[in-house]
Amino acid sequence: MRCVVQRVREASVTIGGERFSSIGAGLLVLAGISREDTEADLAWMSRKLPNLRIFEDDEGRMNRSVKEIGGELLVVSQFTLYADASRGNRPGFTESAPSEVAQPLFDRFVELLRRESGLPVETGSFGADMQVSLINDGPVTIILESPKK
């Protein structure tokens, strides 16, 4: 599982011109599911994200987690995180899990993240054409990948 994590002041998802979901301060998580991902990958990521210390403490150091600041999470499924553009100019997506596999894993990941964090967790709409807006705070952007098996 691969996630691009952005510390945000706010973020939202719009679908078909209508606001679908939004958060205030917290994390925008673009989540990619690979063909090889299992429940263990989802569990690892759902434990890591709420405890990732990328928010500043009183001394200006990245020392606080989204849990500690009482923030929110917006999780958006993004199969393109497993794009392979090493040959040619058109990326291939053979590493990404097919949607019939990825959607239940994504839904399970969100469920685990809600339980693990105890925080509000909003989502995009799996497979939809979405416009994602954000105000990046910092900016702070981190790529996380579940451990290789």
UniProtKB/Swiss-Prot annotation:
CDD domains the UniProt entry points to: Dtyr_deacylase (cd00563)
Any one annotated GO CC term: cytoplasm
SUPFAM superfamilies in the record: DTD-like (SSF69500)
EC number in record: 3.1.1.96
Source superkingdom: Bacteria
GO BP terms: D-amino acid catabolic process
Positions occupied by motif Gly-cisPro motif, important for rejection of L-amino acids: 138-139
Any one Pfam family match given in the protein's UniProt record, by short name: Tyr_Deacylase
Annotated GO MF terms: D-tyrosyl-tRNA(Tyr) deacylase activity; Gly-tRNA(Ala) deacylase activity; Ser(Gly)-tRNA(Ala) hydrolase activity; tRNA binding
Subcellular location: Cytoplasm
Keyword Repressor: no
Catalysed reactions, as listed in the record: glycyl-tRNA(Ala) + H2O = tRNA(Ala) + glycine + H(+); a D-aminoacyl-tRNA + H2O = a tRNA + a D-alpha-amino acid + H(+)
Listed HAMAP family: Deacylase_Dtd
Its biological purpose: An aminoacyl-tRNA editing enzyme that deacylates mischarged D-aminoacyl-tRNAs. Also deacylates mischarged glycyl-tRNA(Ala), protecting cells against glycine mischarging by AlaRS. Acts via tRNA-based rather than protein-based catalysis; rejects L-amino acids rather than detecting D-amino acids in the active site. By recycling D-aminoacyl-tRNA to D-amino acids and free tRNA molecules, this enzyme counteracts the toxicity associated with the formation of D-aminoacyl-tRNA entities in vivo and helps enforce protein L-homochirality.
Family the entry assigns: Belongs to the DTD family.
Protein name (record): D-aminoacyl-tRNA deacylase
Organism expressing this protein natively: Chlorobaculum parvum (strain DSM 263 / NCIMB 8327) (Chlorobium vibrioforme subsp. thiosulfatophilum)
Gene name of this polypeptide: dtd
